[in-house]
Amino acid sequence: VQFARDNRILYQGRGSAANSVVCYCLEITAVDPRQINVLFERFISKERDEPPDIDVDFEHSRREEVIQYIYSKYGRERTALAATVISFRFKSAFREVGKALGFAESQLDYVIKNINRRDRTVPWQTQIENCGLSSANSKVKQLISLVEQIVGFPRHLSQHVGGFVISAKPLYELVPVENAAMSERTVIQWDKDDLETLGLLKVDVLALGMLTAIRKAFALLNEQYPQEVSIPFITRLGDDQQVYDMICEADTVGTFQIESRAQMTILPRLKPRCYYDLVVQIAIVRPGPIQGDMVHPYLLRRHGRESVSYPSEEVKSVLSRTMGVPIF
């Protein structure tokens, strides 16, 4: 983080780290948690069965600078990226088994394009017959059998999106390591779950394309205004009601987190007017609240069309900010 700050690389802490005053004081995050009334306990709770996890996003276009800084500071012997195990999915399994058995690539492509895996009423084993592969053929039988066996089986190792392991000792004394396909990178041959089981500390150095866009926007603004524009500067300005007027009209194309069609559909109905309203807005357009039928009750209560009630008085303090609806 200090390296990024010194080199004017935009970054931001994500997740529950934003609840931490310490992270704010260290400038890992830019929002004062006292201003937004978050739960400190979520980050430092004794009930957690693992150490606090701090994920940091860096500009997508400059993350490699941060990665190489970590390697140069700690050495490639003591620093490496975690691996991700890539497993066979149906298409890759079907294609590779088919090629090994001598089927033409054009035939395999045709079958893959015409199989509907979402159709649970017709098994894929039956669908391939409609594509000209008869299950009476011994080679087709072998193809079906082998595909069924290797779907879900590990295919190859890839690099984790940003999970770094930093050790006091050379990593090769603790875990198997290898050089990555990308130059100047080292990869541990185990995934993050294996590393957590061993108790090795993983630090996530993540990339976010929107931070690159924000930095470019700051550069344009700084050409026009004497006050240097930055994320901390903007967060100190507080809520801008003209911006919220645009948000309520779903004028949010290119706006991080609220630019999807689903978000833009809900924005005029929820009508966010402050930061916490946006927190609810982003959270409510997710599978959990949608499948749990929590969207409509919240909207009705927010606009006074339904009375606010609580399952129990014991949860009132927890659910009061979301009007009795368990969105989070």
Where are these regions (language model features)?
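Alpha-helical scaffold/interaction cores of sigma-54-like transcription cofactors
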Residues: 1-327
